[in-house]
């Protein structure tokens, strides 16, 4: 509450210093929006960290360094990173196709990209199970090829790719749409090949949004629960991820352990987002 009061007073002073004629209702709406953002975003995070701080450092260290927990961290972060890298490549190609080409069903495909946003995660998991389980559409074919997707780490990877793909596509699409075709034509006129034009002219402006989308997709994959709990076997030391482990600890009434594990994930995700934002702002300042 003290933070809210300080921010509100600072905003009011800044507004009145700039223009005394600002309407009172504008000040009210601005302060209300700030309060809303703080209450929705910062208050739950602060509460989680403070609840973790109530425990001793030794208890926290014990909770987050159990072999099962370390294995869950490893599976979660490595699989989410792999999903983010694959989606960065495939999402870039998909965004390029949606922007640069016209074909039957393009609007349907463009709308389908947002499907993971609209679907409940449990429905997404059930959809993946319908396709990749042993009795699904692709399951028997994959089993015949010796590939097991459902109830394996590969299933976790596909679920993470499914929920995080829209972040890549939707962050790159506006950049591609804003690029003028005359720039490419000028590069071709001076003898540049299509591949050289892509790497030297088109790709540099896409680096920042690509990194941003990849980071958002990575963070989204880390927090995925609904689809993974259906696709994976959730066996410790095999394909158990952190989000499912936290829920299991809550079912066992181990609230302190669940809080400690969740705090580590929160801090790691926040640190990654800060690093990506720093890189984005650094590149933006250099291009000015």
UniProtKB/Swiss-Prot annotation:
Coiled coil: none annotated. Keywords: Chloroplast, Membrane, Plastid, Sulfate transport, Transmembrane, Transmembrane helix, Transport. It is a multi-pass membrane protein. It is found in: Plastid, Chloroplast membrane. Residues 73-276 form the ABC transmembrane type-1 domain. GO terms for molecular function: ABC-type sulfate transporter activity. InterPro entries: CysT_permease, MetI-like, MetI-like_sf, Sulph_transpt2. Its main location: plastid. GO terms for cellular component: chloroplast membrane; plasma membrane. SUPFAM superfamilies: MetI-like. Signal peptide: none annotated. It comes from the Eukaryota. PROSITE patterns: ABC_TM1 (PS50928). The chain crosses the membrane at residues 28-48, 77-97, 111-131, 149-169, 198-218, 227-247, 261-281. Belongs to the binding-protein-dependent transport system permease family. CysTW subfamily. NCBIfam families: 3a0106s02, permease_CysT. Part of the ABC transporter complex cysAWTP (TC 3.A.1.6.1) involved in sulfate/thiosulfate import. Probably responsible for the translocation of the substrate across the membrane. This is Probable sulfate transport system permease protein cysT. It comes from Zygnema circumcarinatum.
């Amino acid at each position: 509450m003290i933070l809210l009061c300080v921010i509100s007073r600072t905003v009011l002073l800044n507004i009145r210093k700039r223009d005394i004629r600002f309407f009172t209702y504008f000040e009210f709406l601005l302060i209300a929006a700030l309060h809303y953002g703080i209450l929705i975003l910062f208050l739950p995070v602060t509460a989680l960290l403070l609840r973790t701080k109530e425990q001793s450092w030794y208890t926290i260290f014990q909770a987050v360094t159990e072999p099962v927990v370390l294995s869950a961290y490893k599976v979660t972060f490595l699989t989410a990173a792999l999903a983010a890298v694959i989606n960065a490549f495939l999402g870039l190609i998909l965004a390029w196709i949606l922007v640069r080409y016209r074909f039957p069903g393009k609007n349907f495909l463009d709308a389908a990209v947002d499907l993971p946003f609209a679907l409940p995660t449990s429905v997404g998991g059930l959809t993946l199970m319908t396709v990749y389980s042993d009795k699904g559409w692709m399951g028997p074919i994959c089993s015949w090829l010796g590939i097991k997707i459902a109830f394996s780490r590969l299933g976790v990877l596909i679920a993470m790719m499914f929920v995080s793909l829209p972040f890549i596509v939707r962050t790159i699409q506006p950049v591609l749409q804003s690029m003028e075709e005359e720039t490419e034509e000028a590069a071709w006129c001076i003898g540049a090949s299509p591949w050289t034009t892509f790497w030297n002219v088109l790709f540099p402006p896409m680096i920042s949004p690509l990194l941003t989308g990849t980071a958002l997709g990575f963070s989204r994959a880390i927090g995925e629960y609904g689809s993974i709990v259906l696709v994976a076997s959730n066996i410790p030391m095999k394909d158990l991820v952190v989000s499912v482990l936290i829920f299991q600890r809550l079912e066992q009434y181990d609230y302190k352990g669940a809080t400690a594990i969740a705090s580590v994930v929160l801090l790691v995700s926040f640190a990654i987002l800060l690093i990506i934002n720093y890189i984005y702002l650094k590149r933006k300042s250099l291009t000015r």
